[in-house]
Design a protein with these regions (language model features):
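An N-terminal boundary/leader segment
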Residues: 1-49, 57-60, 281-282, 452-459
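Serine-dependent amide/ester hydrolase catalytic core
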Residues: 8-9, 57, 104, 315-407, ...
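Structural helix-boundary/capping segments
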Residues: 12, 111, 169-262, 273-282, ...
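Acyltransferase
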Residues: 15-23, 53, 103, 267-290, ...
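Residue-level signal for inorganic ion chemistry
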Residues: 25, 48, 228, 253, ...
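Immediate post-signal peptide segment of exported/extracytoplasmic ligand-binding proteins
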Residues: 55-72, 246-254
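Short glycine/serine-rich loop/turn segments
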Residues: 68-215, 258, 371-391
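Short helix-loop capping/hinge segments that flank enzyme active sites or metal/cofactor-binding pockets
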Residues: 68-91, 153, 250-252, 305-360, ...
Length: 459
């Protein structure tokens, strides 16, 4: 994996052209021994070549360019691209009319000169944290990949599965994803990437197919925190500056205990413990936090969270007409929303507001909270693909920690904290909503300490 800053430096120095970078990415996508056919639902080669050539021409003419200019980027296939049909990883939408305009997030990427390589595969309608897709195939996690039998490979995490693997496999430098319950942070954790979930509303969802209008947020998956920071600012319509890294000396980091650490795989527990020791040795002040309200949130959301009723409203007619074309596991989750009563939805809004107030008070003494992004290492695709029980159990486990902070409208990162050669493990660094810039600055300081300790932070 390469960082945006590294690629931009090579482009500026003339060591490589945007067209050369793009052709390398397209070759990886087309490689029959690779994951390209499962990573992308569509490849936009012609428009990407035009964008790469335009970036090269501007650079040659001495035009001042953004850090993303001429850089290959992938876009999750729930963002509208003008002239293309948005499928959201489903067969149901294949024959729908093409989008009349780009989603606003895509408009901002194009305005910054990014080269949109293609639309990436995802969990159907973004409604699972596993990344399994029966319609377009499931991209294999880069860790412990099986060349002989893709089902013996490991899940990439979801729902932004293709976005993650596109970056991990060098098909893109940044992948644009969405995070409603963890769909950026889960695949980032399982694939050894960095993923950023911003405060809801920081980046416009205009032109993005919704899962939950209450919870949907848009975020990048990339190699480093700086990559996420510059991408986030471009997506938010801000100047593409990277905040200066915060030194760890004296930072107050709360380590969440209890519910969020139940049932950790040994590899996750070991990597998380090593990360905590590393940050403490670097001068951060770590203190255990027991915020009991977290374990109550799954009870509040047991009937389908905000996602089920809000998603059902969007899908109601499609399900009546074409339910047989849905992945049954996804259709079943959406249909839970049919049974949510108005008073239950209103009560959930009230419970969320109260939980956010309680969380803000508990968070006040800290600069960030730390916890494992997910409790498990990536299981094999075959273990989940053939068992509804296993699928449901692991999906709940994968979403457990990340979804808490969608409910609380936090902002934060998943950073790789494993050693090279080990199963990827993510360290989640979270803050309350509205602290995005400080979170990205703090994340760079944490990333530097982890890198110095030999953790597998890509550069």
């Amino acid at each position: 994996m390469r960082s945006i800053a590294g690629v931009a430096a090579d482009l500026a120095a003339g060591r490589v052209s945007s067209r050369e970078l793009l052709e390398q990415a397209l070759a990886r996508i087309a490689d029959p021994s690779g994951e390209g056919s499962r990573v992308f639902t569509r490849v936009h080669a012609a428009s990407a070549r035009a964008a790469a050539d335009a970036a090269d021409a501007s650079r040659k003419a001495g035009v001042r360019l953004s850090p993303l200019a001429g850089v290959p980027v992938s876009v999750k296939d729930l963002f509208d691209l003008a002239g293309e049909t948005t499928t959201a990883g489903s067969r149901v939408l294949r024959q729908h009319p093409a989008a009349a305009a780009d989603a606003l997030a895509v408009q901002r990427l194009r305005a910054a000169g990014a080269v949109i390589v293609g639309s990436t595969n995802m969990t159907e309608f973004a409604y699972s944290g596993l990344g399994i897709n029966p319609h377009y195939g499931t991209p294999q996690n880069p860790w412990a990949r099986s060349a002989a039998d893709p089902l013996q490979g490991r899940i990439p995490g979801g729902s932004s599965s293709g976005a993650a693997v596109s970056v991990a496999d060098g098909m893109a430098v940044m992948g644009l994803g969405t995070d409603t319950g963890g769909s950026v942070r889960i695949p980032a954790a399982l694939c050894g990437l960095t993923g950023f979930k911003p405060t809801t509303g920081r980046i416009s969802t205009q032109g993005a197919l919704p899962l939950s209008f209450t919870l949907d947020s848009i975020g990048p998956l990339a190699a480093t925190v700086a990559c996420c920071a510059v991408s986030d600012r471009i997506l938010a319509g801000l100047a593409p500056d990277v905040p200066e890294a915060l030194p760890l000396q004296g930072l107050r980091l709360g380590v969440l205990r209890g519910y969020v650490q139940d049932g950790l795989d040994d590899a996750v527990g070991t990597a998380f413990g090593h990360a905590l020791s590393t940050l403490s040795a670097a001068g951060a002040q770590l203190r255990d936090v027991s915020f009991d309200e977290l374990k109550n949130i799954p009870t509040y959301t047991a009937k389908g969270h905000f996602s089920a009723p809000e998603c059902y409203q969007w899908h109601r007619q499609l399900l009546q007409d074409r339910q047989s074309e849905y992945d049954p596991r996804i259709a079943g989750r959406i249909l839970k929303g049919r049974d949510v009563m108005a008073w239950e939805y209103a009560e959930l809004i009230h419970l969320r507001q109260r939980a956010m107030q309680d969380a803000a008070r508990a968070f006040a003494p800290f600069d960030a909270w730390l916890l494992p992004s997910v409790p498990l290492i990536a299981p094999r695709i075959a273990e989940l693909d053939g068992s509804d029980e296993a699928y449901g159990k692991v999906n709940l486990a994968m979403l457990r920690n990340t979804s808490l902070f969608n409910f609380l409208d936090g902002c934060g990162l998943s950073l790789p904290c494993h050693k090279a050669g080990e199963a990827p493990v993510g360290l989640m660094v979270m803050a309350m909503g509205g602290h995005d810039e400080r979170m990205l600055a703090l994340g760079q300081g944490i990333e530097s300490a982890l890198r110095a300790a030999g953790c597998a932070v890509a550069v």
